[in-house]
Amino acid sequence: MKTVLIALLRFYKVAVSPMLGNRCRFYPSCSDYAREAIQYHGAARGTYLAVRRVCRCHPFSAGGVDLVPPPNSDTRARGEADARSHRL
């Protein structure tokens, strides 16, 4: 499944992206982020991370550097811990 998803991303990068122009507000671009996320985290978790990233890429977003989290990090637990610390 990973191979199929990465092939689809390569097709998008070569065939579709040049027609749309560079619109991504983040570095790396959303398609590069998706490819890295799928390579490092597998098809299911990588796709989840990529969809979250694309949802953050909109005209009202400041953008910037947004790297794929390392494979051993649990982003959900970290986010929940941050939310708890803000409630204190």
Swiss-Prot record:
It comes from the Bacteria. The keyword Glycoprotein does not apply. It is found in: Cell inner membrane. It is a peripheral membrane protein. Pfam families: YidD. The keyword Membrane applies. InterPro entries: Membr_insert_effic_factor_YidD. GO terms for cellular component: plasma membrane. Residues 68-88 are annotated as: Disordered. Residues 75-88 have a biased composition (Basic and acidic residues). Keywords: Cell inner membrane, Cell membrane, Membrane. Belongs to the UPF0161 family. PANTHER family: MEMBRANE PROTEIN INSERTION EFFICIENCY FACTOR-RELATED. Could be involved in insertion of integral membrane proteins into the membrane. HAMAP family: UPF0161_YidD. This is Putative membrane protein insertion efficiency factor.
